[in-house]
């Protein structure tokens, strides 16, 4: 379910075994700035609030209502690091279409904005290939393509050694193969 509230403690109240939710998007981590202390705080809050109710955690970096994490964090290196974190945490990760390509929000020219909430940029179509229609056909989509769609598309990144798509696939394969990544606990270690 979607529980659009700003605190994990409030999300946790909607979990249960009767008429309540068994799984809900947990939005507070989505709003974490690119700071280790902020991420740690949100992860700890999520674990504490949901573990207290024997509830299953979920993790979200981007969605159709918020700027893509690559856009928010400002670089592919940060988007890759966030993907590693997302897919290493116990719980259910949600990948928004295009995260595995490192897509940024599309730039919407004045006059083409349709969503009154300004969410069009994160809703741009996913580019499948480098051709002009990016795998969607000859017609122009109602939203413009994300930046660098000629390179950041499934066909190109599938073949590019070390691409963020290849990283995402390796991380997902490791997660499927490792119960520890899906179900295990972790502890924080001090960093220099």
Where are these regions (language model features)?
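Loop/helix patches that line or flank the sugar-binding groove of alpha-linked glycan CAZymes
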Residues: 3-6, 10, 14-26, 34, ...
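Catalytic-adjacent loop/helix segments of enzymes that bind and process anionic phosphate/sulfate esters
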Residues: 30
């Amino acid at each position: 379910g979607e529980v659009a509230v700003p605190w994990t403690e409030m999300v946790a109240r909607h979990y249960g075994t009767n008429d309540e939710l068994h799984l809900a998007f947990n939005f507070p981590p989505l709003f974490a700035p690119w700071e280790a202390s902020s991420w740690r705080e949100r992860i700890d809050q999520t674990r504490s609030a949901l573990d207290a109710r024997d509830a299953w955690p979920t993790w979200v970096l981007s969605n159709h209502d918020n700027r893509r994490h690559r856009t928010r964090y400002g670089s592919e290196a940060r988007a890759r690091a966030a993907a590693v974190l997302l897919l290493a945490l116990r719980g259910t990760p949600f990948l928004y279409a295009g995260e595995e390509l490192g897509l940024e929000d599309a730039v919407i020219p004045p006059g083409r904005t349709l969503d009154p909430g300004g969410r069009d940029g994160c809703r741009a179509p996913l580019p499948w290939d480098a051709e002009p229609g990016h795998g969607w056909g000859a017609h122009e989509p109602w939203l413009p393509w994300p930046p660098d769609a000629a390179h950041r598309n499934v066909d190109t990144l599938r073949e590019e050694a070390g691409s963020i798509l290849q990283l995402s696939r390796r991380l997902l394969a490791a997660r499927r193969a490792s119960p520890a990544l899906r179900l295990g606990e972790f502890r924080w270690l001090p960093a220099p």
